[in-house]
A protein has these predicted regions:
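N-terminal intrinsically disordered, acidic low-complexity segments at the extreme N-terminus
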Residues: 1-4
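Hydrophobic membrane-insertion alpha-helices, especially the h-region
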Residues: 7-37
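Aromatic-capped interface at the extracytoplasmic side
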Residues: 28-55
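Extracytoplasmic/luminal low-complexity segments enriched in Pro/Gly and acidic/polar residues
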Residues: 199-258
Length: 258
């Protein structure tokens, strides 16, 4: 009796064709991202309702730059380079550089599927020009430079979930108006740390001996709470009617930042 051999199966042409189609679609999307103008980033921020705004974009969506504004304030020129490797961690990440005449920062930003913004590896410096602009509304004229290192933060919406950074001010002469008089004092270099405490970012400033001078806490409602210890008042050379212990909190202020 003759054996009947079943015909060989046809090659999976349909599956191969589908794979080529998908590969073509992916290549087309990658080409769109690479070739898209940098203005697309500004439109994405606007659609997301972010408080930041980009103007005068140049370059491409993949690698470009634009002028960064936050709450209407010009923060300088922002440069970005998308980091495709961050997609393996479930994030859309980019290496960033922010530069202005009075400051320069660099680091990496990533947005996860949960909408959280993560900043890592932040370092930079704030020079006298930006320090003066920042403190002028409080009748303070500083000098010197503040350097930052080991900076990181996690932000969701307008809430700061976690924050970490170390900073150092080079010190120098400072003029300030208080009690209807103008005071001048030379300060030594001061160190500061930014840490999360009870779910709130807290900035602590210390003297060269490591003793606390003041601290600022930012709560979930956008209020910054400032506490000044007598040790700082004495360091500033301001006469105080009493002579309390150095750790005594003598000034408490609150200001809503957002």
């Amino acid at each position: 009796m003759a054996e009947l051999n079943a015909p060989a199966p046809a090659p999976p042409r349909r599956g191969r064709a589908l794979a080529w189609v998908l590969l073509g679609v992916v290549a087309f999307l990658v080409l769109l991202v690479v070739a898209a103008p940098a203005g697309g980033v500004a439109r994405i921020l606007e659609a997301a309702g972010a408080p930041a705004r980009l103007a005068l974009p140049s370059g491409r969506l993949w690698s470009g730059s634009a002028q960064l504004y936050l709450e209407g304030r010009d923060l300088g020129r922002l440069q970005w380079d998308l980091a495709p490797g961050s997609l393996l961690d479930g994030q859309l990440g980019a290496d960033l550089v922010l530069e202005a005449p009075g400051h320069r920062f660099r680091g990496r930003a990533g947005v996860g599927t949960d909408g959280r913004l993560q900043l890592t590896g932040v370092e930079g410096e704030v020079r006298e020009a930006s320090l003066d602009e920042l403190l002028r509304p409080y009748a303070i004229e500083p000098s010197g430079t503040v350097t930052f290192r080991d900076g990181s933060a996690t932000v969701q919406g307008q809430r700061v979930l976690d924050a970490h950074a170390d900073a150092r001010w080079s010190g120098g002469p400072v003029s300030y108006a208080l009690g209807g008089q103008l005071w001048r004092q030379r300060f030594p270099p001061l160190d500061a740390t930014l840490r999360a405490r009870d779910g709130q970012p807290v900035l602590v400033v210390r003297d060269p001996a490591g003793e606390e001078l003041l601290d600022v806490a930012l709560d979930a409602a956008g209020w910054a709470q400032l506490r000044v210890r007598y040790r700082f008042v004495a360091l500033a050379g301001f006469p105080w009617p009493e002579n309390p212990a150095p750790d005594t909190v003598v000034v408490e202020l609150a200001e809503q930042l957002y």
